[in-house]
């Protein structure tokens, strides 16, 4: 799947949202690098958010703002910890999931957003996880297994 997405990036084909789940940093870093190098310096703005420290609203506000000096924006939303199983009230940051779910159905066409969940797995029972997976290209960043 990564090879297909990387090829699409190189051919100028981009979906509005990507979700990368998994602990293999090579695939995460390489996906971001290939996406970034698919544009020239003046064609794209790169903005990064840490969702363990910043609310989703920051990502959505940035995504809905038209790029000023470029054609597109790439937003990297790292550490999407709200996608994993946690006890209620244990999240450090409160996120507006209703707004997020509405935004997922109508994302900006000038922004490519990559949500990174660097965890072994996400909580498939959560509504927000289901919505994000339905409205994104999902990539599994797993360590390749040697098959003999």
Where are these regions (language model features)?
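Conserved beta/loop motifs at nucleotide-recognition and modification sites
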Residues: 1-148
């Amino acid at each position: 799947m990564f090879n297909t997405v990387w090829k699409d990036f190189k051919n100028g084909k981009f979906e509005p949202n990507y979700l990368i789940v998994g602990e293999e940093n090579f695939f995460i870093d390489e996906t971001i690098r290939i996406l970034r190098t698919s544009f020239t310096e003046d064609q794209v703005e790169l903005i990064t958010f840490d969702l363990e420290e910043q609310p989703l609203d920051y990502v959505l506000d940035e995504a809905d703002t038209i790029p000023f000096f470029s054609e597109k924006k790439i937003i990297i939303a790292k550490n999407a910890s709200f996608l994993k199983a946690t006890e209620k009230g244990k999240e450090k940051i409160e996120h507006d999931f209703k707004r997020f779910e509405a935004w997922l159905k109508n994302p900006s066409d000038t922004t490519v957003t990559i949500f990174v969940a660097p965890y072994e797995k996400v909580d498939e029972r959560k509504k927000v996880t289901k919505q994000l997976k339905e409205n994104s290209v999902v990539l599994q960043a797993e360590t390749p297994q040697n098959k003999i």
